[in-house]
């Protein structure tokens, strides 16, 4: 498949979105909550009719979870320079526990805002940021623990259920909603769509088993949940580097990622104009945005880890919190005493954040300042409702290093920090590996659930083998499906370029689709209510040779259509009862249909006679020769 060129400007990107973003045979619909401004998006995939001897039978539309935001709504005009609608602004203002600041609190933020050299790069439609009023806590966990159901929680309940309970009484959906029993492996999943209530969401947030990453300054956000008892989510990474790229390219990567199904995005920029790049992404993102603040703090030192200070890092946290970043990866578990444990590893410390903090600890022979200042970090987090993504700085970089003392020592420290964050009512998820062979994955999940008190687990794969450079989206997708079933709440995607180079748009697409497959497989295995609906619809379309429906119900309709058309490009092939794999004479599904038609055409007497012979055969012991 040809690779698409990146957008040259915001104007060309907007034009491209208007022309190419729409999904085939789909409509954008909304579920309305208890108030008119709770409008939860979902995508409905339209199906063609089934042709029978008795005429055409309608096939119902299939609702699917949608991460694409307003970009897939034909009624919304996209203006990247103005940003997306502020869907949460009224909810936040009505709570009365925040205040609009007179200006930016971060020294670095003020410097960037007043620097004439970056004026042409800045997002022009900025408003002053909000912060909690003195003594207030504005986290979703704090509200949940006070018994308050926020609009964000109600939004999540509708989004997770897709209102599937309304379909169970409709005859058209009866067969499509059949589902194999799952094995939730001890998780407390809702049994039916109607069990996914706002109160259920509140309880999960209050317990710490789930988070709603939703900074009060990211008003464009469409709320979503990350937790063991919800749908498995996936994260996509983007970010510029010293050798790439433009602001428009990074916004394009974000939009491209959510088009294919990324539930959250991490901006891992390490190149020029990190601050401005992040602002453009946030103002145009309907999904939560995460960052690794130590990257930008290191950039401020000129790349010298030893020169990092708590004061510099604190200013970076505030700068990013006031922009609207929803979760921070913070490597507070990389303790001085753990660093020597990595000495005998094959690949040492492979986390960028982990290596930065390890180098700082060794250079100063002091404890990690992220650990010693953790309570102060919590004060910042709860003032803006930024969630922790506690980083696994000592994750294994190869399967030989998996499950060692350094990895699990850090994990136990992350559990200690989770308990500390929860005392502040700050939301937490835990980052996990990495590279782990299949037989050692369950131990990772068990350790996390035990020592981190069921806080959501967020893993990078894991890759289950190290022998396939160029195919690590597959080696990691195998591990991701397994650990997702075992209880991981969010899977960080891996692209084919992992370990080899910076991914382009097509690599991002490949990684996201791979991880959508893994997450969906995990939902099926867990028994998420309604998870099998799309599988059943596609299987029925496949058996009935409804080729267009097969394409459109898939995760990547364009890829499926292009593969089919490579050998059978004619339009007539879209209604043919065969494909190029078996041809017209050897198609098993076509033969099965012919057998069914033949059986249905037999007189009742003939059918009865065959049934009698069948019974006689069984009574004789099912022996062909006596």
Curated annotation (Swiss-Prot):
EC assignment:
4.1.99.17
Q: Name the cofactor(s) required for activity, per the record.
A: [4Fe-4S] cluster
Q: In which pathway does it act?
A: Cofactor biosynthesis; thiamine diphosphate biosynthesis
Q: Where does Zn(2+) bind?
A: 435, 499
> Is Heme found in the keyword set?
no
- Broadest EC class assigned to this enzyme: lyase
**So what does this thing catalyse?**
5-amino-1-(5-phospho-beta-D-ribosyl)imidazole + S-adenosyl-L-methionine = 4-amino-2-methyl-5-(phosphooxymethyl)pyrimidine + CO + 5'-deoxyadenosine + formate + L-methionine + 3 H(+)
How the cofactor is bound: the record states: Binds 1 [4Fe-4S] cluster per subunit. The cluster is coordinated with 3 cysteines and an exchangeable S-adenosyl-L-methionine.
Q: Name one GO biological process term.
A: thiamine diphosphate biosynthetic process
> InterPro entries, per this entry?
ThiC, ThiC-associated_dom, ThiC/Bza_core_dom, ThiC/BzaA/B
CC per GO annotation:
cytosol
List keywords of the entry alphabetically. Answer: 4Fe-4S, Iron, Iron-sulfur, Lyase, Metal-binding, S-adenosyl-L-methionine, Thiamine biosynthesis, Zinc
GO MF assignments? 4 iron, 4 sulfur cluster binding; carbon-carbon lyase activity; zinc ion binding
The record ties this protein, via Gene3D superfamilies, to:
6.10.250.620, Radical SAM ThiC family, central domain
Amino-acid positions noted as binding [4Fe-4S] cluster in the UniProt annotation, renumbered to this chain: 579, 582, 587
State the Pfam families in the record.
ThiC-associated, ThiC_Rad_SAM
Q: Which residues bind substrate?
A: 237, 266, 295, 331, 351-353, 392-395, 431, 458
Instruction: Please describe what this protein does.
Output: Catalyzes the synthesis of the hydroxymethylpyrimidine phosphate (HMP-P) moiety of thiamine from aminoimidazole ribotide (AIR) in a radical S-adenosyl-L-methionine (SAM)-dependent reaction.
Quaternary structure note = Homodimer.
For this chain, the family text in UniProt reads: Belongs to the ThiC family.
Entries under HAMAP family matching the protein? ThiC
Protein name per Swiss-Prot or TrEMBL = Phosphomethylpyrimidine synthase
